[in-house]
């Protein structure tokens, strides 16, 4: 499936690692094609097959990859996680350019 990424809104992110933790829970690491700035506590929005969902970022802002914990939610409630579960290292997803969320760690 070819998807045109809207400039200024989305970018591609490549799956660089995937670690299955349980039957329905895994970690995945994404390498965005552009620098992705975020604060601890924010989330990113990723997509595949025209479906988008928000996921809390588990990695540090100092890392060059985005680490996510994903729980499989089967259809009909889960539309994106079954697609993400089928991804292999090297596959790409869309990612919104900006992190969101106001529940961030405040400096002391």
Report residues per predicted region.
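Short secondary-structure boundary segments
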Residues: 1, 7, 97-99, 107
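Helix-loop module immediately N-terminal to the HCX5R catalytic loop
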Residues: 89-102
């Amino acid at each position: 499936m070819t998807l045109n990424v809207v400039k200024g809104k989305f970018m591609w992110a490549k799956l660089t690692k995937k670690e299955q933790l349980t039957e329905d829970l895994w970690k995945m690491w994404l390498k965005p094609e552009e620098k992705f700035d975020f604060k601890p506590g924010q989330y990113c929005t990723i997509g595949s097959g025209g479906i988008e969902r928000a996921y809390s970022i588990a990695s540090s802002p100092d890392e060059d990859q985005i680490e996510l914990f994903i729980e499989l939610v089967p259809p009909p409630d889960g539309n994106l996680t079954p697609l993400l579960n089928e991804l292999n290292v090297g596959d790409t997803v869309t990612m919104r350019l900006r992190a969101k969320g106001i529940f961030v760690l405040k400096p002391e």
